[in-house]
Amino acid sequence: ISAVRNFSSNSSVKPKIILHVAQLQNSDWWANGVTSQAGVTDFDILGLSHYFLWSTVNKNTDITKTISDLTTKYKKKVMIVETAYPWTSQSADGYNNIISGQNAVDGYPVTKEGQLKYMTDLTQAMISGGGVGMIYWEPCWITSNLKDQWNTGSSWENNTFFDFTGKPLPVIKYMKHRYTF
């Protein structure tokens, strides 16, 4: 944090400092530990990962309340800085997908339209709670010839903004949706 602040003092660039925690159910406990116990308060934004598969906070009303409570309690801006939702249960390669179509959230089928609805509703829930931004995790991580120690391809290509041929999916529209502020 001090390195960023030192850089900012001598630059026209003023980066924001985000502290990032995984999953909404951990956010208050973690932020309390960081601020009250460790005394770290010099940051601008509390960043949250939200993956429905690993979260116990999945109802939009609960997401809104969690973000609102964090904003009020810690007097910091809050963003969802990692999220994703699958558009298909299929795979374009032999690499097992991390999030499969069998893990759908009620009301959000694992389809192109379901992915768009999920992202639109999640973004509105975040905004309704006072959140200031949404970042989608790896929207371009389509299959490729990339080989890692586990396999060749992508374990995420069913969560991207592009189909298996590279064509943009409807989910991109969530960024231009008219939200209620």
Would you name each region that the model predicts?
Residues 19-23, 30-61, 65, 77-88:
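Aromatic- and acid-rich polysaccharide-binding/catalytic face
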Residues 90-121, 125, 129, 137-181:
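Aromatic-rich peripheral "rim/lid" segments of glycoside hydrolase catalytic domains that contact
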Residues 4-8, 21, 38, 50, ...:
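Sec/Tat-exported extracytoplasmic proteins
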Residues 1-30, 76-85, 133-139:
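Aromatic-lined carbohydrate-recognition surfaces of secreted/lumenal glycan-active proteins
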Residues 59-111:
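A beta-strand-loop signature enriched in Asp, Gly, Thr, and Trp
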Residues 1-4, 33-34, 62-70, 118, ...:
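A general structural detector for well-ordered alpha-helical segments in enzyme core domains, enriched
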Residues 19-22, 56-72, 97-102, 123, ...:
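Short secondary-structure transition/capping segments
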Residues 10, 34-42, 69-73, 127-128:
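Acidic (Asp/Glu)-rich catalytic clusters
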